[in-house]
Design a protein with these regions (language model features):
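Short, Lys/Arg-enriched N-terminal segments with co-localized hydrophobic residues
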Residues: 1-4
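Compact, Lys/Arg-rich rRNA/RNP-binding cores from ribosome-related proteins
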Residues: 7-156
Length: 156
């Protein structure tokens, strides 16, 4: 059979979720009005939705199964162009918020919670890993460091 790589931090093989259909133009039932789609993305972004949520809303309520087939670029790119979105890339921000949650939990009388202690270590490893990638891409300053005590300031 096919040799599958293991999942990160698990002893399981990775069996992927759903895969998108291979198409290179938007289906005829979909909304292909590029201006309207772009405006929707900007509006939803201003309303504070994450790019993942925006994609789901566009898919479920506005008949846009795939923004890239309509606009030729990603939702995150559109948001960045209209300078909406945080200082940090979204995936990294989500991990940082998760880390803050675990730190709060461990700090409020649960310092012996070993499973979550490990969860925090894993989350922080993922943050550092992403940070290295974003530094190489030039989306983070090269002197940026992950510091647990400064994390709250970064997230807010």
């Amino acid at each position: 059979g096919v040799v599958l790589m293991a999942r990160m931090y698990k002893s399981r093989k990775g069996k992927s979720g759903s895969s998108k259909p291979y198409v290179d133009e938007a289906p005829e039932w979909s909304n292909t009005d590029a201006k309207a789609v772009k405006n929707l993305i900007v509006e939803l972004g201003k309303a504070g939705h994450s790019s993942a949520m925006i994609g789901t809303i566009l898919r479920d309520q506005h008949a846009v199964p795939n923004v890239r087939l309509v606009l030729g670029k990603r939702i995150a790119t559109v948001l960045a162009e209209s300078s909406i979105g945080g200082t940090y890339p979204e995936d990294m921000m989500n991990l940082m918020q998760r880390a803050v949650g675990i730190i709060n939990h461990l700090g409020s009388g649960n310092h012996k919670d070993l499973h979550n202690k490990r969860g925090l270590e894993i989350t922080e490893a993922k943050i550092r890993r992403l940070a290295n990638y974003y530094k190489a891409e030039g989306r983070l300053p090269s002197e940026w460091r992950y510091k647990r005590d400064e994390l709250r300031l970064m997230v807010e």
